[in-house]
UniProtKB/Swiss-Prot annotation:
This is Metalloprotease TIKI1. It comes from Xenopus tropicalis (Western clawed frog). The gene is trabd2a. CDD domains: Tiki. Residues 1-23 form the signal peptide. InterPro entries: TIKI1/2-like, TraB/PrgY/GumN_fam. Residues 24-485 are extracellular. It comes from the Eukaryota. GO terms for biological process: head development; negative regulation of Wnt signaling pathway; proteolysis; Wnt signaling pathway.
Length: 508
C-alpha cells in the first residue's frame, strides 16, 4: 500500500464500516513478549540460494511497532543485497507525480465540481480542523518546529484544486490521532532510510501512476457518495454520536499483537459485508459495494498480479542476489496475494515465524539495525541520490506498452557503469549546490518561462501544491522546518500515497 490500498483501506473502512462502539484509547498498548518466538511475524522466505524475503509493513510511525518486529526480520533486512519497495520513496519524481495526480484539470476547482451542500460542509469541516489543530499538536512537535498553521497549510493548502477523491482521503487524515503522529517516519520510509544509510541497492516495483490512476478512475457520482459518507462520519465524530470503528491504534495493536488474519488485514471477499454500513438505504449500499469491489480489484488483485510478476522477473535476472521486498502487509494476506502469484510461478514461499534462524548468506552486514528503538536511532534526514535500479525500471516501463510485464532491468556490467555515472553525477551536483536532505520538506522546482510551476510541500508524506507567481532568472524554494523527519504516503501505496495517503497507503 506512501501504498494505495494500504492508504485507502483504513480510510474506506472509516467511510463504510459499521462496528460496535468501543474505545481504542489503550488498544495499542499490548505487552511486548520477551520471547522472540511469541512475537508476530510478517516475514516470508522465498526459498532459493541465496534466499529472498517478503516483509509486510504498515503505514504508521515506526517507533510504534519497531520493538515488536522480530529479530529475524531485521536480520533478513541486514543480510539482503537489494531492498525493494512498492514505490521509490526517495525519488523527487515520485513526489511530483503524486502532486500532478491529485490536481483537477487546469481551470477547474472543487466549487464547480461538487454539489453546493457538500462543498459548504467540506469548507466548514476544514475550518473546524484548522481551529482545533493547535490543541491537537504535542509539545514535542512544537519543539521540533512543527506548528499548527504551517502543518494545516501543508496538508490542506490548495484543497480547492484537488480532485474530490483526494480531498476525501485528506479529510480522513485530518484527525487528532493522525496529527499527533506527524513528524516520525512511518515504517516504510524508515526502512528506505536505513537501506540508504547501509548503502544497499534500492528499487521499486511500481510507478506512482499505477497506484494513482485507479483512484482517479472512480466516476464522479461514486466519488461524491464517498465524500458525503466521509463528511457524515466526521460530523458524527465531532458531535460525539459515533466512534471510529477502526482506528490507527487498532491497526497497530493487530500488527504488534493480533491475529495475522485480522479483519483489518484480511482482504478476503467474505469480510466485505462487515464493512458495509447496513443503515444505508438499499441503493446507497449497492453503490458502497460497487466502490469496494472496484478498489479491491484495482488496488489489490491487479496490483498483486503485476507486483508478483515483477518480483519473479527480478529473481530470475539476479539469481545471485538476495532481495528484501517490503510491501504493505495487505498484499500478503487474504486471497490472490503476491505470495500466491509467486507460488504459481513455481517458487516455494514459506511464512517465517519469529525466533526461526535466518541463514547467513555471507553477503550481508550484521548488527546494523537497532534491535530496540531509542531517540538516538531516529534518522535526522536522508539524501536522495538517483535510484539506480528503479530509474532503469521507470525508463523501461515508460518505453513498453505492456506494463504488466517487467522489462529488462540491469545486468551486472550495467550496474557497475551506472554506479560510476552516479558517482560522477553526485560530485558535479555537490559542487553546484549544498547537499539536501529528504527531511528538508521542499523540492527544488525548475522555473519555466511558459508554465507556472507548482510549489510542492511534503509533511509526513502528504503532498500539497499551490501555484506561485512566475519569476524568471532563479529557482524558487519552499522553506520549511529542517529538524523533523517526515514520512512519504501511498495506498496505499498512497506512498505510500498520503497518510490518506497515510490512511489511503496503511497496509500498502
Amino acid at each position: 500500500m506512501v501504498i494505495i490500498w494500504n492508504i485507502f483501506l483504513p480510510a474506506f473502512l472509516l467511510v463504510l464500516a459499521k462496528a460496535s462502539l468501543r474505545s481504542s484509547r489503550d488498544s495499542a498498548n499490548c505487552k511486548l513478549n520477551k520471547k522472540q518466538s511469541q512475537l508476530n511475524s510478517f516475514l516470508w522466505t522465498i526459498k532459493r540460494d541465496p534466499p529472498s524475503y517478503f516483509f509486510g509493513t504498515i503505514h504508521v510511525p515506526y517507533t510504534r511497532v519497531w520493538d515488536f518486529i522480530p529479530e529475524n526480520s531485521k536480520t533478513a533486512f541486514q543480510q539482503s543485497n537489494i531492498v525493494y519497495f512498492e514505490l521509490d520513496l526517495t525519488d523527487p519524481y515520485t513526489i511530483s507525480a503524486l502532486t500532478s495526480c491529485q490536481m483537477l484539470p487546469q481551470g477547474e476547482n472543487l466549487q464547480n465540481v461538487l454539489p453546493r451542500d457538500i462543498y459548504r460542509r467540506l469548507k466548514r469541516h476544514l475550518e473546524y480542523v484548522k481551529l482545533m489543530m493547535p490543541s491537537w499538536m504535542t509539545p514535542d512537535q512544537r519543539g521540533k518546529g512543527l506548528y499548527a498553521d504551517y502543518l494545516f497549510n501543508a496538508i490542506a493548502g490548495n484543497w480547492e484544486r484537488k480532485r474530490p477523491v483526494w480531498v476525501m482521503l485528506m479529510v480522513n487524515s485530518l484527525t487528532e490521532v493522525d496529527i499527533k503522529s506527524r513528524g516520525v517516519p512511518v515504517l516504510d520510509l524508515y526502512l528506505a532510510q536505513e537501506a540508504e544509510r547501509l548503502k544497499k541497492r534500492t528499487g521499486a516495483v511500481e510507478q506512482v501512476e499505477e497506484q494513482c490512476h485507479p483512484l482517479n478512475g472512480l466516476n464522479l457520482s461514486q466519488v461524491i457518495f464517498a465524500l458525503n459518507q466521509t463528511l457524515l462520519q466526521q460530523e458524527n465524530l465531532r458531535a460525539g454520536s459515533v466512534q471510529v470503528p477502526y482506528s490507527t491504534e487498532d491497526l497497530i495493536k493487530h500488527y504488534n499483537c493480533g491475529d495475522l488474519n485480522s479483519i483489518i488485514f484480511n482482504h478476503d471477499s467474505s469480510q466485505v459485508p462487515n464493512f458495509i454500513n447496513s443503515t444505508l438505504p438499499p441503493q446507497e449500499r449497492i453503490t458502497a459495494q460497487e466502490i469496494d469491489n472496484y478498489f479491491r480489484q484495482e488496488l489489490i488483485y491487479k496490483r498483486n498480479e503485476r507486483m508478483g510478476k515483477r518480483v519473479k522477473d527480478l529473481l530470475e535476472q539476479f539469481p545471485e542476489k538476495s532481495f528484501f521486498f517490503a510491501f504493505g502487509a495487505g498484499h500478503f494476506l487474504g486471497n490472490n496475494t503476491v505470495i500466491d502469484v509467486l507460488k504459481r510461478y513455481g517458487y516455494d514461499v514459506l511464512h517465517t515465524p519469529a525466533g526461526r534462524s535466518i541463514i547467513n548468506n555471507g553477503k550481508g552486514k550484521k548488527n546494523l539495525l537497532p534491535s530496540k528503538f531509542s531517540s538516538s536511532s531516529l534518522p535526522v534526514g536522508l539524501s536522495a541520490p538517483p535510484c539506480t535500479v528503479t530509474s532503469r525500471i521507470k525508463q523501461s516501463i515508460n518505453s513498453h506498452k505492456d506494463q504488466e510485464s517487467l522489462p529488462d532491468i540491469l545486468l551486472d556490467d550495467d550496474i557497475d557503469q551506472l554506479d560510476k555515472d552516479e558517482r560522477k553525477y553526485k560530485k558535479r551536483k555537490q559542487r553546484k549546490e549544498k547537499h539536501r536532505h529528504f527531511s528538508d520538506l521542499w523540492v527544488r522546482i525548475q522555473e519555466s518561462s511558459t508554465d507556472t510551476t507548482p510549489q510542492i510541500r511534503i509533511i509526513n508524506g502528504y503532498i500539497t501544491v499551490e501555484p506561485h507567481p512566475r519569476e524568471h532568472g532563479k529557482d524558487k524554494y519552499i522553506k520549511a522546518a529542517q529538524s523533523v523527519s517526515f514520512s512519504l504516503s501511498i495506498p496505499s501505496a498512497f506512498l505510500l500515497l498520503a497518510w490518506c495517503f497515510q490512511q489511503v497507503a496503511v497496509l500498502q
